[in-house]
Amino acid sequence: MRNALLSIMILVSLIVGASTLTRGHEWGDDFAWYIVQAKSILSGTTDEFMEQSAFTNQESTTHLGPLAYPWGYPLLLAPVYAVKGMSPLALKLPGLLFYAGFLVCFYLLMRDRLPQIESLLIVAIFAFNPLLLQFLDQILSDVPFLFFSTLSLLLMTRAGKRSLLHYIGIGAAIFFTAFMRVTGILLLGCLLIVEFFRLLANRSDRGTVLEIVKGSATVCFVFIVLWITNLLLFPSGGESYFSQYAELIETARAAIPAYFNVFSYFFGNTQAWKYLYYLVFIFFLLGAWNHAKQEPIFILFFVLWIIVHITYPYFQGPRYIFPLLPIFIYFALQGMKFLIARLPEQYHPSGQAAVYGFWILIAGVFLVQSSLTAYANLQNNRGINGPFDPYSTEVYNYIKEETPPKSVVVFFKPRVMVMMTEHPTIMSMECDRIRKGDYLVLSRKVGENQQIPPEEIDACNLPLDQVLKNNRFVVYQIQE
């Protein structure tokens, strides 16, 4: 019966999530680079991609991102692109499937720690969560990363005697987590730190010491072999991440409040949800304190993840804390149970009922909100938005059909332009830098967002010849 409930929840989550997917995409252009990397895998042009990426990054006004994202997610997109081409809807399907996989892993992770009814309840919170289900409309690596990080935690924290195959599984799971996002390597660090202290605590037990050493060595060996294979198959561009950690202290000082508050978006955007989050946060602290000895890997991963991200200069909103949300909600529930256990015994049943009622209500509200969003999307015929709308397509077609193949385009989202036209593209917020291009495309809707607005471009005194204009864009040829 309980497994049937889990299956029903996951099925409902898949239906609602699939109904939330649109035929367009938001204007952020990280997604474009994942798709371009996937295309380069299929065409065998990964080295040419790296050259193109270096040009876009080096010639633009500011840093746009790493030269290449980890190749795991582009590898997942490649077969979809091979079959469906540039179809945003199809390219979102891997995220949907990996989200279902995450829910299964999360249930198994909780089943070892909570009564089955609580495991199902906590999974329901995630299965119907509006933030996460709406995020499935993004072509980004965060959801596959969430799956692999949760799978890694599941394997790393499994109780009982571990076989060689189990350690191989841990090493592979951690590798695939890092293959999605470099920060997945924190899981390997967490495992080794916890195993080191376990070794110290059992140093007089030769059998346990040998088990720890052999197990840790196996995990590291599997990870290293897979990582070397990755380096041999794909060019590396991740080192450009580290150049962004320049002013750690100032970055952290500004980011700490942002990362504290961003957890509230798991519940909702309104002030009422934020106040509810503050209450849940107290229970989270209580649960983390009470279970620190039982869950050292959870605690260590949470702390290291926060440290790494508060020192990273680019705040990306809730998606950067997705891997921590299962730990956060788990500890919050444990904090509530800890408080109930301290009440007089006659209040235990009513206290437990209150906790269950609270989470059931939250799950119900989440399901209603997500269902309404999905229904509105279907009523809108899965609207085509952002860089895939007709006005944008008109610009891409002009660039592809009416300009020389190697002409340089200046555009506020250069990686999108590269994806759609294969033209070398840069971003410029300076008049002089615009001269590096052959064509200038300005958005009429975004103001000073990584561009000089159309209404201010005349002040640059550039030799511009307008060649196309529609409701969203104006295109200029830059004269010699």
What are these regions (language model features)?
Residues 2, 6-11, 172, 216-224, ...:
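Signature aromatic-anchored transmembrane alpha helix within multi-pass, membrane-resident enzymes
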Residues 3, 158-163, 187-221:
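Perimembrane helix-loop-helix junctions
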Residues 13, 119-130, 134, 154, ...:
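Short helix- or helix-capping micro-motifs
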Residues 28, 131, 137-144, 317:
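Short acidic/glycine- and proline-prone juxtamembrane loop motifs at membrane-interface regions
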Residues 103-104, 202, 264-295, 299, ...:
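Hydrophobic, aromatic-rich transmembrane alpha-helices
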Residues 111-116, 152-167, 201, 290-292:
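Membrane-interface transmembrane helices that cradle and orient dolichyl/undecaprenyl
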Residues 178, 197, 210-286, 363-373:
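Membrane-lumen/periplasm interface segments of specific transmembrane helices
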Residues 355-415:
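Membrane-embedded, lumen/periplasm-facing catalytic core of multi-pass transferases
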